[in-house]
Amino acid sequence: TLLASGFNPVPFRAGDPGATTATAAADGTAAADGTAAADGTAAGTARSNRAGGEAALFERALAASRAGSFAAALPLWDQVLELHPEDAAAWSNRGNVRLALGDAAGAIADQGQAMSRDPEHPDPHLNRGTAEEALGRWQAAAADYRWILERDPQDASALYNLGNVNGSLGDWPAARDCFAAAARARPGFAMARSSAALASFQLGELEEAERQLRALIRRYPLFADARAGLTALLWRRGASGEAESHWVAASGLDPRYRQPDWLLRVRRWPPEPVVALEQFLALAPQAAARPVGVTP
């Protein structure tokens, strides 16, 4: 999968000409840092238009990208584009790699090149939106996601990313609506369901948030996001013993949930759950320090 750092929209989509667009991170487990990737299709030259070595070069570049070997993938995409400058998929994929390497402006430029070559394909808009989010260009990102949703109102990735944008703008009711719509559009999209629950937490609807988080944990017992969210919620509601039990599991699954800055900037939690989890960690040091696997 392709992962970019520093923010958490669901996913840019990887180009593989001739493939059908796949769904993104359906179980939600890959969405907890950067961008959870969907191995789908960015627009571009059909596979049949590449002969032997050129097709192999494209596949090498794609494989390196999916493996997270971004520094190795970038020059491979450069070579592909030297041979096929009209290949929209290659432009979009190179843009994804540039974003993963921290070059959001370069990523936006590459996605624009992809759009100019295949104006009606949604993936470059999704990918450009993630890069715009990395730069805090919320309105520009929202415009890209809405462009997709005007054409496909059930695009779960665009709905989820628009929810993140709404949250960044402080509109948590709209964010929750988008997350819930993303979860309906893609059954099994656990991160969307968790984000909707956390938005309910932010809005003071603790019973609804607790119901959603418990349902997620029953279905995905190893889903750290839901366990960390339920830890914060239970602490806020005064159920400290059960909060500690869930924290043992959450922190063992993913220690980044100890980091408030990561929660706010990368995972994109709302502020109220972050504050509650910080209070839990400050006032329940025995839970924060307990070795993984030791239950209260």
What is the predicted role of each segment?
Residues R218, A224, A228-R258:
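TPR/TPR-like (Sel1-like) alpha-helical repeat modules
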Residues A55-R66, P75-D78, A89-A100, A109-G112, ...:
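Conserved alpha-helical positions within TPR/SEL1-like repeat arrays
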Residues L83, R117, R151, R184-A185, ...:
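Structural marker of alpha-solenoid helical repeat scaffolds
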Residues V10, A249-P296:
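Terminal, low-structured helical/coil segments at or just beyond the last alpha-helical repeat
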